[in-house]
Design a protein with these regions (language model features):
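Non-transmembrane, aqueous-exposed alpha-helical and coiled segments at domain scale
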Residues: 1-190
């Protein structure tokens, strides 16, 4: 997967078995395929964990076969809150967003203020990063939309828990894709 978020999905039917994927590449259904989530993806780790658990409950080996770029922008609760608040504020001019935080996460990526997957693996610096980000987003949430400010500590705890779950899957995706290309292997981007 090279870009996008968990707003869209792929529905696959193989041998009568229906599988719906939002983040995990469809190659996961083939046992010898390595799968990657690249740096262009805005990643809801919560949604990814749910997708992994659903697939593993069906007997698929997923966690050892999916690698995540350390540069992926992470979708966190403030992105979803902003997405929903903006959509509601538009009233009859709503754009039809899924309210899953994808647009606001891309905004943070472009503005160079968002968290990336690698940030979740560095607990010593994580709190300061989240505090800096929430200085900005809590102002918008409270002053523009009249919402309650998010707790830095709650967001740090949530991020650390997700980082611990995914730490073994974060890898140099670009480097591995380069190796595969040099070996003459076929690579499919979706």
């Amino acid at each position: 997967r090279f870009q996008g978020g968990h707003n869209a999905g792929h529905t696959l039917v193989i041998d009568g078995q229906k599988t719906v994927l939002h983040l995990i590449p469809s190659g996961i259904l083939q046992p010898d395929v390595e799968c990657f989530i690249g740096n262009g993806v805005v990643l809801s780790l919560k949604a990814l964990r749910e997708e992994i658990e659903e697939l593993e409950a069906k007997g698929l080996e997923v966690r050892s076969r999916v690698r995540i770029s350390p540069a992926c922008a992470i979708i966190l609760p403030w992105h979803e809150m902003l997405d929903r608040a903006r959509e509601e504020a538009r009233g009859d001019r709503a754009i039809g967003t899924t309210c899953r935080g994808i647009g606001p996460a891309y905004e943070d990526k472009v503005a160079r203020r968002g968290l990336r997957t690698s940030d979740l693996l560095n607990p010593a610096k994580l709190e300061a990063k989240i505090e800096h980000i929430l200085d900005f987003h809590n102002f918008v949430l409270t002053q523009r939309f009249g919402m309650k400010a998010l707790s830095v500590q709650e967001m740090v705890d949530q991020a650390l828990e997700l980082g611990a779950y995914f730490k073994d899957q974060v890898a140099d995706v670009s480097g591995r894709l380069y190796e595969l290309r040099e070996q003459g292997r076929r690579v499919m981007f979706e």
